[in-house]
Each structure stands twice: as structure tokens, then as C-alpha cells.
Amino acid sequence: MSFGNTTETDILNLIMLGTALPWAAATELDIHLHTASPGEGGASTVNEATYTGYAVVTVNRSSTDWTVTGNQAVNDNLIQFVVCSGGSNVITHASITPEGSTQIIAYSALGSPLTVESGVQVQFGAGTLTLTLD
């Protein structure tokens, strides 16, 4: 996953200036789906999925939802979106934002595009959503 530009600036301000992350107090994260890259300078609303029934999934920022080992964070639980009830999208990217915000913390292309149409439920199994710092 790549960091969004605003998040990169936030992290540099934290490291170099001691400025707290604006979203440091957020206890939850939102997972978004996209039909194309939202881009490093983009917001989570850029190219966001539009199929009927789509809604972001909110997960906790906690050790019960994520395992951090070395330079990687991995989801510990199933992340499951609502079943598509109409329309269709080809999902190519996912992003993570602070809950209720459009600021992209990180985003990435999926391993392969996923066609979502009526009856399809997008999900990330435990251990399949990985954020790596390098």
C-alpha cells in the first residue's frame, strides 16, 4: 500500500516537528473500494465504488483487529462489505481512511480486478489486507 500525500506530510510533521497526527485520536478506520486508483493526492471519494448497497466498512484500530510485526500490519478478522444489490463495478483498488474522513492514509491496487454485480459480496479474509512500510 502507498500513503496518501496528506498522510505523508502528517508523518513528516510528526517525526520532524513533533506535531501530532490530526487523526491520532481516531479509534476506527474505514476501508473503501475504488474502480480506479484514487491517487496519492486524492480523497477516498475519488473513483469510489458506486454499486447499489456499497458502503465503507469500519474497523477498529486495535490489536484485536490488526497485528503489527516488523514493518507490516495485517488484518486479523474478516472484512466484509454489504452484498451488491444492483448495478456493477470493477473494483481495482482499496483505501484506508480515518473513520468518517476522506483523507487517504494508504491505498493499493488489488492483486486482480474484481467484478461486483448483484449478489456479490466483497471481502478481505483475515490476513489478506497488508500495510507495509519500507
Identify the meaning behind each predicted range.
Residues 1-94, 98-134:
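Small cysteine-rich, disulfide-bonded extracellular modules of the LU/uPAR three-finger superfamily
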